[in-house]
Amino acid sequence: MKSKKFLALLLVLVMAISVLASCKPADKPADADKPAETTEGKEEGKEEAPAETGALTEMPTDGEPDADQYINTFDTAHPNTLDPAKGSDSYGNGILLNILEPLVRIQDVKGQMGSVEYVPAGAESWDLSEDGLTYTFHVREGNVWNDGTPVTAKDYEYGIKRCIDPRTACPYANNTYYIKGAEKVNKTKLAEGQEPDYSEVGVVAKDDKTLEITLEHPVPFFIDIVTTRIFFPQRQDLVEQYQDTYSTSPETAPQCGPFILKDWVINSEQNYVKNDNYWDKDNVKLSKYKVSIIKDSNTIFNALKAGQIDYAGVGDPKWKGEFLNNPDYYSTVRANPDTTYFMFNCNADSNTGNNKVRQAISIALDRQELIDSCYNGVPTAAFDFVPPAVTVQGKEFNKLGEGWVKKLAEDNPDPKALFEEGVKEAGLGDPASVTIKLMGSDTSQEGRTSGEFVQQCLEEALGCKVEVDNQDWSQFINIVQTGKGWDIAWLAWGADFNDPSNFLETCHSQTAAYPTGYKNEEFDKLLDEAKVEQDADKRVQLFHDAEKILLYDDAALSPVIHRIANVFRRSYIRNANYSFFSTMGMSRIFTSGRK
């Protein structure tokens, strides 16, 4: 999740991962058509969880397709919207990859588990100018919306500009700032009834089949950003017709991808059918698939065992025994480029407005005990926000088991004393009477258990009170977005593309994912410099310096865990996505040998 930006995923996904994620890898300026290998490649294997007995090193991709092609899978929550310009959670991202058509997609390289490549999608090809500033996308002939209207370059142009439009309040708008003139327009305060001035914005549909995008400066990973939802096509006529209800339901969501979302029952199920008008329909094998909304991990595992769903992430050792050496399943293990974290309310009127209070909370949490007690030892402790699976133009950034939070703990051996000092500075009174309100979005048993663990851990270590409030995703995000009524929000962020900026810019004061009140001019400056810097080594240092400010000096957030995906699939599943960065959705999966 953006995630963007908000890939704020339910913590139950530590135990049961839906694997419909949508994120991306980085390309090199000299070769805009070839992405860098992700950290799921061979060189990064040392940072993944140890391979389980029976885990595959190559995904099954071949086999005679069954006559009846269908898949049953699950997700843990319903999206707030299907609007590419309005949503930001992984639940919506996963749907949009299947019902809309990005200009470019990212797929696994067959026979090279962990490697990925760009493939033409809504654009049949694209060119990059010699100066690295102008991308020309040649929009494909023959793709149509579900009402028969042709998909044109103007739909992509409109979609991007709608995300830039400040009236839209697009949560991913900062990822358009690489485009010439986009940031200025997005930050313009418009008078009532005033339209944005796009005359200097570098997004132009030259004709129905040619889209030209001009950047402020060369961006090594720009094609990765093009695969995200803010570059998906949108229908201006339907936005104007439906207004606030645009893409809030299957009926008001225009679709042009490999599948059509036929119907859904909110918080129950989603039903998809193959789009017979899709340009690449011959390579789409599934005729339908169903996504059930299941929040409880035991219910998920029972559904997998009973054949009600065809794959799931399994972390519980008791359940692993049911699947690991069972010939009816195969498994894969992958380190995810994501981080669950405590996001602190830094506003002065919150109980976490003081940086020493935040620092104390960050180092008081026993991450490994949390992992062992609540998550069966599956994920890994996080001491940096940017996960080890994310690189800088192919260069290693963070190492597993190291990080600024660990350094902070080493330099402050008494978190209670630090907490009391911060409480005194903030004028909060008696430390024992201070109540820290922790909000979470996991209403499952795992969510309650992990919340209770954190509550006990912090109360014992700091001598304060901790109140835990778990809400379902919609209520949670609505409360968090007010910036009031909470001190800590337990969130998750998953990479939308393979670059530290995708994580760190969620805390930039001008592009913040949430209204936390956090602002540090030096932090912002370092990220601004990294945005235009072309040298990978210099970018690494800029990001490290920025992350130190964020986690060590200011403790604006506190990373908790990096997740491991241990996915079990039915033996008849073929061509499933392995890479976290794949954007193929369900379009290449099929079954062979289903009994």
Task: Say what each PLM segment does.
Residues 157, 162-165, 169-237:
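Surface-exposed binding/hinge segments that line
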Residues 380-422, 442-448:
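Structural transition elements
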Residues 107-113, 188, 208-209, 215-284, ...:
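Gly/Pro-rich hinge or "lid" segments in bacterial periplasmic/extracellular proteins
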Residues 567-595:
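Long beta-strand-rich cores associated with HINT superfamily self-processing modules
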Residues 242, 277-322:
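Ligand-site clamp/hinge motif
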Residues 371-372, 408, 465-476, 502-570, ...:
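Extracytoplasmic/peripheral linker and loop segments enriched in polar/acidic and small residues
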